[in-house]
Amino acid sequence: MSIINTSYVEITTFFLVGMPGLEYAHIWISIPICSMYLIAILGNGTILFIIKTEPSLHEPMYYFLSMLAMSDLGLSLSSLPTVLSIFLFNAPEISSNACFAQEFFIHGFSVLESSVLLIMSFDRFLAIHNPLRYTSILTTVRVAQIGIVFSFKSMLLVLPFPFTLRNLRYCKKNQLSHSYCLHQDVMKLACSDNRIDVIYGFFGALCLMVDFILIAVSYTLILKTVLGIASKKEQLKALNTCVSHICAVIIFYLPIINLAVVHRFARHVSPLINVLMANVLLLVPPLTNPIVYCVKTKQIRVRVVAKLCQRKI
């Protein structure tokens, strides 16, 4: 360890953190964590399977929901290897190249999820504001084009991350703050000038903030449209179609905002709190989104139950 921490030796291996102070209980902590990953993967896989196999769900809203499920699957699978290696096998080491690759996929799928939530907010606005032209505007081809464009946009946005991190020198510390690699966490360990990473990281965070602002704008327009509907029953019916999406937005953005505030203003907070919040960031959205959409979306719920009943028969 003395060689690794020497300032004259460039670091090529990082050490991730499990639960600080609870290392003795990692094997027991792995049980709920592995269960959450399993439920998230099965839940999002089920959403994708139901939408693919049910022709009646081949509509814009459900295509966008399948995009959300794919981004959730990507988030889960990106962090899964290091989390399992720490809690199951007590192996916190990760090579620098593997770390840079992991942070690319984690940030890429996070940006993609933010983009999908933005698309879904405009989808809900269009469905409520102009229902007669909804299907003619959002055709299958146009939905596919939107999905491809936003996927490329998400990956291109984070593509510089691993290359800028790779150009930095790491020669003092090699202990990261989480169970997986994040851009802002890795760049803090650099002993060379990391201003480019700081600026580009801020730009990436700004893009997420723009998505959030546009989602808020779309819901302001939705609320304005709903208030213009004469019937209270129709107002509630229109708003009810947005509940699942609003829950998904809160579940995704709230942990990001909390973690950003902690990193920026509460630097002396307990490392355990830091790790817990970071794990919530990647575990909770993929875990809860399928549950929320199955519970609140009748079309999904009915078909999931029907598939389960068929298997029992």
From Swiss-Prot:
It is a multi-pass membrane protein. The chain crosses the membrane at residues 28-48, 57-77, 102-122, 142-162, 199-218, 239-259, 275-295. Residues 1-27, 78-101, 163-198, 260-274 are extracellular. This is Olfactory receptor 51A4. GO terms for molecular function: G protein-coupled receptor activity; olfactory receptor activity. GO terms for cellular component: plasma membrane. It comes from Homo sapiens (Human). The gene is OR51A4. Residues 49-56, 123-141, 219-238, 296-313 are cytoplasmic. Disulfide bonds join 99-191. It is found in: Cell membrane. CDD domains: 7tmA_OR51-like. Its main location: membrane.
